[in-house]
């Protein structure tokens, strides 16, 4: 959500395939409801549209198995094309259909959390994709990148260093940027408060973006996929 909103333009589309939660689609619904209740948000959305002359990026619901099919159907119906589509997929390969969807991606970015269960699951997921899809060259995938999410700043350097060594030994690739564990990532638009950080309609408030790790992550992801860093002021 933050990646798409931070780099929002008409080249982006968000596809919410995290069945059954569909958390991104639900967030868009909350955003729209809160805009209708908050005059400041209405003005902000209007000024944003006047400035960039583009609507908010679309969000559609889908199942992991049907994500690519639904994307093409959407583009055919709307007569639109997109340079970038962000898929919000569950971190599991539950069925053959999910594997086909994952194989159709260009890049996969896997968030990591320094928890043994989460790490074992994430690394196993990534290793399977590397060995069964990328290494065999029978898919569209160009690469998989891991990145640290919810990093504890209170001092667990030894733990992160140990996991980094494991990742290196497994031959997996880790982004240098990371996202700290901070409450600002929970700050959505609401009817009474200002200073939005997480939203499907607005980019993060610049005052809260400092030390969030988000600009660095966006820049590194853009470099990885061969995209010039977006103008986040648009």
Model-found features: residue ranges?
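Beta-strand-loop-alpha "switch" segments that mediate conformational coupling across diverse proteins
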Residues: 150-199
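Conserved C-terminal guanine-recognition region of P-loop GTPase G domains, centered on the G4
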Residues: 125-135
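Switch II (G3) loop of P-loop NTPases
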Residues: 78-98
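Inter-motif core of Ras-like GTPase G domains
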Residues: 97-116
